[in-house]
Design a protein with these regions (language model features):
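Covalent nucleotidyltransferase
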Residues: 1-221
């Protein structure tokens, strides 16, 4: 990711950097669930946070433009522009965004370990950048383009997730199985209360499965 961006900046091309295609579900009130592209958006947010950490180290304070961009891209007040999956989100905010957690204790999942490792990697690599270089690469991120498709119905979103295949990481078999369960609940469950209860149960059970797999992978490593 960083190498690609650096190559783009050094190429001085007139075209914008391309982040790929994203699939969203419109949840209303200007909130969108990410159906496809979660991993890329997580990486982008981690990278921007690492840039701002380095900028603060160099300059001591942010310019008005930097403050505006940070509020637009990452966080303004107590409003977060991006959230990752529920079971990783608190760690994501504490370690990456707010920087109130500075150790690696209590990491429960492999995905949490990857979040911490990615942030630490970017912080380490960006130590070699001066303020001008940081702004150059931040500008490339801010002006990057992407294509998007947005759906309003969760059942359609789940169905599209199952069959979507683009530049992002291909869903695992477990993720597809979970999506199939959710899709069938939407398809065949007529009671809204029962539907909500079943969806919550499926998500909770799969969260437990993900954590169990993560612990097993950690023991193997």
């Amino acid at each position: 990711f960083l190498v690609d961006l650096q190559d783009y900046v050094e190429s001085h091309t007139a075209s914008s950097y391309y982040f790929g295609h994203f699939l969203f579900e419109d949840k209303g009130s200007r909130n969108f669930a990410i159906i496809d592209g979660q991993q890329r958006l997580t990486t982008i947010t981690i990278f921007i946070s690492a840039i701002y950490r380095r900028l603060e180290e160099l300059a001591g304070a942010f310019s008005e433009d930097d403050i505006f961009l940070y509020g637009t891209l990452v966080k303004v007040g107590q409003t977060y522009r991006f959230s990752t999956v529920d079971y990783d989100n608190q760690l994501f905010r504490d370690y990456v965004i707010n920087k109130v957690k500075t150790d690696r204790n209590g990491l429960e999942t492999e995905s949490q370990k990857r979040i911490v490792a990615a942030y630490d990697y970017f912080v380490s690599q960006l130590n070699a950048y001066d303020e001008e270089s940081l702004h150059d690469i931040l500008e490339a991120v801010v002006n990057a383009t992407c294509t998007t498709h947005t759906v309003k119905d969760e059942a359609e979103a789940i169905q599209m997730f199952i069959f979507q295949n683009n530049r992002g990481k291909k869903p695992s078999n477990l993720e597809i199985i979970k999506a199939q369960f959710l899709y069938n609940i939407h398809l065949y469950c007529t009671s809204e209360d029962e539907k909500a209860e079943l969806i919550s149960e499926v998500k909770n059970r799969f969260e437990h499965i993900y954590k169990s797999i993560s612990k097993i992978e950690g023991n193997i490593d």
